[in-house]
Amino acid sequence: MDGSSFLDISLDLNTNPFSAKLPKKEVSVLASTHLKRKWLEQDESASELREELNRVNSENKKLTEMLARVCESYNELHNHLEKLQSRQSPEIEQTDIPIKKRKQDPDEFLGFPIGLSSGKTENSSSNEDHHHHHQQHEQKNQLLSCKRPVTDSFNKAKVSTVYVPTETSDTSLTVKDGFQWRKYGQKVTRDNPSPRAYFRCSFAPSCPVKKKVQRSAEDPSLLVATYEGTHNHLGPNASEGDATSQGGSSTVTLDLVNGCHRLALEKNERDNTMQEVLIQQMASSLTKDSKFTAALAAAISGRLMEQSRT
């Protein structure tokens, strides 16, 4: 029997159907979708990073602007404080403020609120009210001065001046008298091109003594030191009355200064005497005026009538 005569009874069945490979088109589609998904995820993360970066940049810009405003405000406040400190101390602590002299009316010497102009009498109620208010103010000041301790008024009333020789090239305005002083201001006055320095005694916390030092306008080789008040503590050498100034080999004590101070007191006494003479001459000339005496008599009679009514 011939082999070609046998029949092929094989069914050609595929026992592993999943082992077949996918077509190339399907593989490319899957790869592209996977890449697109990754790209989308990367784009989302990149956009989030960009938003975060923009937010941080805006916050940084705001903080920079705030810092610039704070620095500007600080500089303005600092400059304002320096201006206040430079002009506040000399203006507040200065005691010798020049007072403008005015011509006093004749009635001010006599104490009556009478206004005279070209021989005419002007007796108004406003002047009487002003005089009454002035009297009340004086009584109030007297009561307050009585309540104050005697030491306080004594400290304010005591003023002494010391003249210290120094070199004209020295601009320190320092007078060494043994005490410790704290400088709180300096100012240029009208009557002297040299500045005036203001000091406060720091030897004791509660010491009220103040010192003003300025070069003399008449003699630039002298320093004029003015002391106001009395020390409430012992001095460095247990003697408060000594005011010694040492500048190189030159020493000036109060014995030297008292002479200059005495001359100043004598000058003030002469000025007061001259003022009294002028007042007496003015009073005598006014009493000779018949119109003035008539106005004065009318004012006195009016005042007496008012007092009798009350």
Swiss-Prot record:
Coiled coil: none annotated. The keyword Cytoplasm does not apply. InterPro entries: WRKY_dom, WRKY_dom_sf, WRKY_plant. GO terms for molecular function: DNA-binding transcription factor activity; identical protein binding; sequence-specific DNA binding. Transmembrane segments: none annotated. Transcription factor. Interacts specifically with the W box (5'-(T)TGAC[CT]-3'), a frequently occurring elicitor-responsive cis-acting element. Positively modulates defense-related gene expression and disease resistance. This is WRKY transcription factor 18. It comes from Arabidopsis thaliana. The lineage of its organism: Eukaryota, Viridiplantae, Streptophyta, Embryophyta, Tracheophyta.
